[in-house]
Structures are given as C-alpha cells and as structure tokens.
Amino acid sequence: MVRLGSYCEHNGSISQAWLDSGLSPCFYFTLVPSVLLSFSFLLGALQSALYARHSTTMEPKYIPRSRLYRLQIVLSVVLILQSVIGLIWQAAGTDVVYGYMIVHGCLSVVAWGFSLWLLHLERTRALVREKSRGHGVVLLLFWALAFAAENLAFISWQSPNWWWLSRDTVPQKVQFGLWITRYVCTLFLFVLGIRAPGRPRKPYIVLINEDERDVETSQPLLRDPNQSTWQGFKKKLLLVMQYIWPRRNIPLQLLVALCMGLMGLERAINVFVPIYAKKIVDGLTEDSTWNILAVTVCIYVLLKFLQGGGAGTTGFLSNLRTFMWIRVQQFTNREVQIRLFAHLHSLSLRWHLGRKTGEVLRSVDRGTSSINSLLSYIVFSILPTIADIVIGIVYFTSSFNAWFGLIIFVCMTLYLTLTIIITEWRTKYRREMNTRDNEAKSRAVDSLLNFETVKYYNAEGYEVGRFNDSIMKYQVSEWKVNASLAMLNQTQNLIIGLGLLAGSLLCAYFVTENKFKVGDYVLFGTYIIQLYTPLNWFGTYYRMIQSSFIDMENMFELFNEDQEVKDAVNAPALMFRSGKIEFENVHFSYLDGKEILRDISFTVMPGQSIALVGPSGSGKSTIIRLLFRFYDVKGGTIKVDGQDISTVRQESLRSHIGVVPQDTVLFNDTIRNNIRYGRVSATDDEVEEAAAAADIHERILSFRDGYDTQTGERGLKLSGGEKQRVAIARTILKAPQIILLDEATSALDTETERNIQASLAKVCANRTTIVVAHRLSTVINSDQILVLKEGQIVERGRHEELLLKGGVYAGMWQKQQSGSESSSDSDSERKDRTSEKLQPPKATPRRGH
C-alpha cells in the first residue's frame, strides 16, 4: 500500500535550502520544475499568442526532414517519461511518496510537455516578418536553464542526502540513473537547440521570395528590420576572431598571451580583495596585534592598487593590459581595412555600378571600427564578467550557504534573460536607425557630388529640404532607440537592487544571530558591489556587442559578395606577342532575357585601328568592357594573340591595354600624380614627357602651381579638354600595346576635338586600337568600321566602302553632315566655356601712390 508522507523527508521544511553540506532535495526538486514551468508557461504563452496573431503555416516543402529534429522530440519525450517513471518507481519501490516528489513529477511533465509544443509550433509555423533562422529565445533559454539546473547538483557533492558519496542502496542507484538521464538529455537538447535542425536553413521569408531578387545587385528585395542580430553568430565570430591572433608575428602573439594572463590574474585578485577587507574588519573587532593588522592592510592596499576602482577597470593590471593591447588592436584594424579594401577592388564593375559609394564607405567605416570594439567587449568584458559571476556563485555557496549562491544565481538568470529579451526587441529600432543614417549620409554625398547640377536648376532649397527629411526620419528612429534603452536600464537596475537588498538583509540577519561575523557582512557587501559593478555594465556590453554586429552586417555582406569576374586557379599570364584581337561569336547580356550583343565576330590585326559606330544602346561600349574583362561573355570567346582572355590573369591582360574613356574622372590630387597613375614608378621627367606628347605640358605650366595644381573632386577644376589630355598623358605613360578609346571626344567642341585627335593619333600610332565613336568624322581613317545596331554587326568596311553601300552608315553620315554647319557656332561657345575652369595667373598692375 502506497503511503503519502510529508512534503519533505523527515518532516523537514522546504525553506531549509542547505542541509548536510548540500542542497536539500526537497528544496531543489521543488525549485527547479517550478522555475522551468513558470518560464516556459509565461514566456511560451506570449510566444504562442504572437504566433497565433502574426504567423503563417509553412509549406511542407520548406520544412526540413532531419533525424536530429527527431532526436529533439525523443529527448523531450524521454524527459517527460523519466519524471513519470521516477514517481511510479518511488511509489512501487519504497511505499512512501513525499509531496515534493509529486510536485516535481507533475510540474516537470507539464513544463517539458509545453516545450514540446513550442518545438512543434516553431517547426510548422513562421512569423510573417521573421527573417532569422533558428529557435526562438524562449526555447533556447528554457533548455539552457534546464541544463544549468542539472549542474546545480554538483554543489551537493559532499552531502549524504545525494548519491555522490554512496550508491549502495537501490533508491540511490535509481535516482543517480535518473539524474544521468536528465543531464545527458538536457545537454543534447541545448546543443541541438543552437543548431536548430528542425528549422529551415534559410529564413522562411527568403525561401518564399528567392525568385524575387534584384538581378543587377544580387540583393534580396525584402529586407526585414526584425532580423536577429545573432543570425549566423558562429560564422561572424569566427571571421572576427581570426584577426585577434596575429599570424606570423611572434611579438604580437606574445602580447596577446600576456594580456590573457593578466586578465586571469585580475579574476583571482577580485576574489582576494573582499577576503582581505573581511580580515581587516575582523582584526579591528577582535583586537589583533598591530603587526598582523599592518601586514593585512598593506596586502589589501596592494590588491586594490592592482585591481583598481572596484571593478578592475582602472587598476595597474588593467592599464598595463590596455597598453599592451594597443599594438594588437592596430594590427586588427589594419588587417580588416586592407582585406576589405582589396576585396572591394576585386568585385565586378556591375557590383560597383549598383551601389552608392557613400553607403559603401559608411558601411566600411562603421564595420571596421566595430570589429575592435567587438573583440574588446568579448575578450575583456563579457568573458571576465561571466567568470566573476560563476566564481561568485561557487564562493558564496561554499563559504556562506546555498541561499547566497541561489540569490546570485536567480538574479543573474533574471538579469541576463530580461536583458536579452528586451535588447532583441530593441534590435529593429537600432537597425532602422542605421538604415536612416546611411540614407541621410548618402543623400548628402550625392548632392555634393552633383554640386553643379544643383546650381544649374536652383535646387539648393530642394536639396536642403530632402536632407532635412532624412535627418527627421533618422531622429524618429533615434528616439525609439534611446527610449527603449532607458526602459532596459530601469529593468536592469530594479533586478540588481532587489538582489542586493535580499542578500544584504539575509547576511545582516545571520550576523545578528551570531552565525556570521561583522567581517562576513563587509565581505559580502564588498564582493557583491564588486560583482554588480561589471554586471551593471553587462547590459551595455550586450548592447554594444549587438550594436557592433549590426554595424558589421553590411561589412560582412561586402565580404560575402562573390567576385563575378575572377581568375581561374593557377591561371597563366597573357603571353603578349603582337596584339591581335579576335571576337568569335560573342553573346552577352547584363540581365537575363535581354541580349546586348548577339553573335559578334571580328578581328583586329596588330597595329590596325577599328571603329565601332551605331546608335546609343547598340553595344559599342559593352565590347570595350568585355575586352578589358569587366565582364565575362555569356557565349563565344575573346582572344588576344590566340589566347582566350577568360583563361589568363586579369592583371596581365590589363597591363597591355590602355583606355581613354568618354567621361574622364580624375583623383582629387595633383596633376602630376594623376598623370603618374599610368605608371606609378615613373619619374617627374617621364611624367612631363607624357604631358608634352599629349599637348598639355605648356597649359599645365601656365597654372599657378604647375604640375602641383590640385584637380579637385573628380577633376572638376579642369575643363573637359584638359581632363581628356591628362587622361591621354596617363595612357601614354602606361605605354600599352592595345588602345581602347570609348567616345573620348564626344563631349568636346569641334576645335578642342581636333586638337585632342592629334594627341590621340600619337598614342595610337603602331598600336592595335579600337575606337568607339559618335562623330563619324573622327573615324574615317580607320582600317575597318563596324556598324552595330540592336547588338548585331549590320555593316562592316572602310569609310568609302560603307558610303557606297548606302546603308545604315551612309544614313548616319548624311545626317551628321547636314547638321554640322548648324552646330559649329554652339561648338565655339562650348569651347569658350570649357576653357574657363583654370586660367593662368594674370599680372596685377600696381597702383601708383
């Protein structure tokens, strides 16, 4: 006959948490399922309500079939069954069932049953606006709490009420077996929960919209502000951590090791500071000798000197560690920026044309600076704080009693849980603020880069208004971020205050009962304040880490951008011989379904010049870009001296090609350095020789600063003709064997064009040349003219031959000739305007006195 005993064994009290050098089984097996059920039911109910309102049923084809998910189900069911089996065995095997056993069995069944329901809910439904993958915060924290609770059993290692010391009886063996089952199951559930095998590998919103992508930029059209910052946490962390260890730099590696050692020493000092404070107080109250007291005080002051202002943030060790870390931090910053800058230059022209430079630079700036912050917060703030918390729990549990360890444990759990929940909720506001900030900065940069256009249309007020709108939107998002931050800080302060109050009252009570000494109260107060000081910053650390991850998201996206045009593994260099160019049945399209070039075939013999003419959009400039390998062809081949350019290294191909584009963009540097960019190792004499060959040497000398004249942003201080001549001089200095002229004179007046043509003739002499021309008069002497229309070559031949055919070329020639007279006057006026940019200094006559 089963007999129902008292609630606790031996008529004990549940309030007696510490019993016989360990946790009371009655207290432990009541507390753990109560906390788990409360957590899973309260927060799980909120999650269920959220899913009921905002979720949609996932299509079966998107739900992964995983054995690991089945293992999650099995482990949860095992935990439910072990609670029932343990209760049944207790009733059948011992004939006595205590109240706490019934409570433990019932609450555990309900808690794990509810977690099983949440697991099924997250597998079959998805939030409409959710872009994160993986399990929700509720399940992850539930499994973490369950596993942490099983680890609390180790505190009772020396207690005879548990199975650690002796497992001679059957009940002890059964209880130990049930604990092993719970420990293994909760451990695997926690690990599997991080992997989330039952959830899609991609966010559901991405799966159902995979076809709705911007082809040009390869970016998802839908961008959700609610995406979890911790999505891809492992990948991000591994990418960041590789910069903390300076490879091939032994001195910096030693600095990293020393910094880690100092950080460990700080943790030990944090324990001894309160202990010596207790010894001083006990020595003063117990009339210790002066010698002992003086030594104790000296040791205490030395420890405080090493530790610093209560939290190890301004002490000798901390300052020494910070000083040694400077070089490591500089190494990290340099490596990230150089690697990212090189990666950006390796991306295709298509990618750069699809991005705003201001936004890219803003993302790079914030991303690189956030990496150092992230490393500092994780290595020197988060890890030490967690270590201090664990050490504090173990110390107070072993040196005081379990109540103090329990108070700290509960406060830490509540603090971390609420911090994570509220901060995750705030993420969307932070991300929105970053987006608005990018938009505002990009709008300002775009407006300033188009300064002349703004002036042409008297649009200053319009631009200021647009910028004001951007700032207003940014400040709305900023207010949400700061308001939610204030709420988080209040929540954290409340939890810390309640924990400090509970511990202080309990310690004071034991002092009045003569169970503790006054020094013990001082030790507790000193230690707990010392512990809570970094804990008070824990929320800030979490927010800053999250903020750093948010700031790095765009930078990681840049790192993840694949090179559209990249060299094959072990690709050889181009073996240049004479400069023969062959296009064989070339097809190309920027977007799928719309071919720009169709079956293009032609050959340029060494030293010959070929002209590409035709209406806008016919594919002339595309041929230039394909030959320079800004893009790879979709079909056919392009050969230089019989070698397919897609199989050779880009660097070797481009070293033999010189380009003079239609819109020459100069660096904001001196004219000398802009010309020298054609060959950075060139001497000043070689630069001036190239300028003379481009017929701009005398013009440069007429400027006040000569070759040291600044060209301004994008070369805006120079006229169009001057910029083109600088570009020609740059190409002459490069001395390429192949010349590509992409409508190099189309934006110039007739007289300037004639002068430029003379300079171009010098550049192209005895070189293979391809010219894209709008004005047919500039290509009449070409060895061959190709007429393109709608991506196809419709005519080819010399100037006279094409005129005799009376086809497309003849029509274009006739049209341009008939309009040449009417445009001559406007050309002269344009010349006058374009030569006004930089004028040589005029002598200023002196006035007489």
UniProtKB/Swiss-Prot annotation:
It is a multi-pass membrane protein. Residues 47-72, 120-136, 195-254, 313-373, 423-492, 542-849 are cytoplasmic. ATP binds at Y590, G614, P615, S616, G617, S618, G619, K620, S621, T622, I623, I624, R625. Glycans are attached at N11. The chain crosses the membrane at residues 26-46, 73-93, 99-119, 137-157, 174-194, 255-275, 292-312, 374-394, 402-422, 493-513, 521-541. GO terms for biological process: cellular detoxification of cadmium ion; heme metabolic process; heme transmembrane transport; intracellular copper ion homeostasis; melanosome assembly; porphyrin-containing compound metabolic process; tetrapyrrole metabolic process. Homodimer. It catalyses: heme b(in) + ATP + H2O = heme b(out) + ADP + phosphate + H(+); coproporphyrin III(in) + ATP + H2O = coproporphyrin III(out) + ADP + phosphate + H(+); pheophorbide a(in) + ATP + H2O = pheophorbide a(out) + ADP + phosphate + H(+); coproporphyrinogen III(in) + ATP + H2O = coproporphyrinogen III(out) + ADP + phosphate + H(+). SUPFAM superfamilies: ABC transporter transmembrane region (SSF90123), P-loop containing nucleoside triphosphate hydrolases (SSF52540). Residues 814-849 are annotated as: Disordered. Residues 581-815 form the ABC transporter domain. Belongs to the ABC transporter superfamily. ABCB family. Heavy Metal importer (TC 3.A.1.210) subfamily. Residues 1-227 are annotated as: Required for ATPase activity. ATP-dependent transporter that catalyzes the transport of a broad-spectrum of porphyrins from the cytoplasm to the extracellular space through the plasma membrane or into the vesicle lumen. May also function as an ATP-dependent importer of porphyrins from the cytoplasm into the mitochondria, in turn may participate in the de novo heme biosynthesis regulation and in the coordination of heme and iron homeostasis during phenylhydrazine stress. May also play a key role in the early steps of melanogenesis producing PMEL amyloid fibrils. This is ATP-binding cassette sub-family B member 6. Residues 1-195 are annotated as: Required for the lysosomal targeting. Contains two independently folding units, the N-terminal transmembrane domain (residues 1-205) and the ABC-core domain (206-842) are respectively responsible for the lysosomal targeting and the ATPase activity. Residues 814-825 have a biased composition (Low complexity). GO terms for cellular component: early endosome membrane; endolysosome membrane; endoplasmic reticulum membrane; extracellular exosome; Golgi apparatus; Golgi membrane; late endosome membrane; lysosomal membrane. N-glycosylated. It is found in: Cell membrane; Mitochondrion outer membrane; Endoplasmic reticulum membrane; Golgi apparatus membrane. It comes from Xenopus tropicalis. The keyword Transmembrane helix applies.
